[in-house]
Amino acid sequence: MMRYPLKSSFAEQIRSFVDYKNSLGFPYDESCRILWKFDNFCAERFPEKDSLDRELALAWLEKRDTENTAGHRNRIMVIREFAKYLRAVGTEAYMIPISMTSKGPRYVPHIFNEAEIKAFFHGADSFRPHEKAPARHLVIPVFYRLLYCCGLRPAEARLLKKENVDLVRGAVYVVESKGHKDRVVAVADDLLQIMRSYSTLISEIYPDSDYFFPRYDGDGPYTKRWTEEMFWRCFSM
């Protein structure tokens, strides 16, 4: 459901687009905020336009002085998804070419060998309960196994909510992932058993948390910095 007030000629189409995403079982919170800004942009800059044409799309493409590369790319990708939806329902729309979106510096990944992976998970399993982080020893082994076994990105797992983890069917619903796309990830039986046991234990500690991996106080997810620090600590255990 679109929670922001809309005023442009695209208002009904935006609402329908969000309803479509919601009908698939995925919230669209961050994208809704971007769509709301797009609606304001259209109402102020192109009040007479009722179609997502090239002129409007390229105007939206322009990078702002205070905008970083990731933020610029995110708002472009949301409107690409919107244009794709419009085309699917029979409405003409200009899709910004993917080649025109911002790209960050190229990153060369390190491929871990078997010994490094074994050492990493030995470290992950070696954490002990801590008075200021009573569930850290439960979270870390499952969090990084989910990344390793299912290919989730750190932010996707970190922000994962309980409602998006199906421990019956063995599925994780990833919402608002890279490119503002949603997907369903299957969980293997051995990892599923681990996640079920973890869920039972973590719910006893943080029964009211919405997050599958709640932070030390149970009031939200862990930070990006925390996941990076714990990653390197796993190698030093």
Residue ranges and their predicted role:
Residues 1-237:
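Conserved catalytic core of the tyrosine transesterase superfamily
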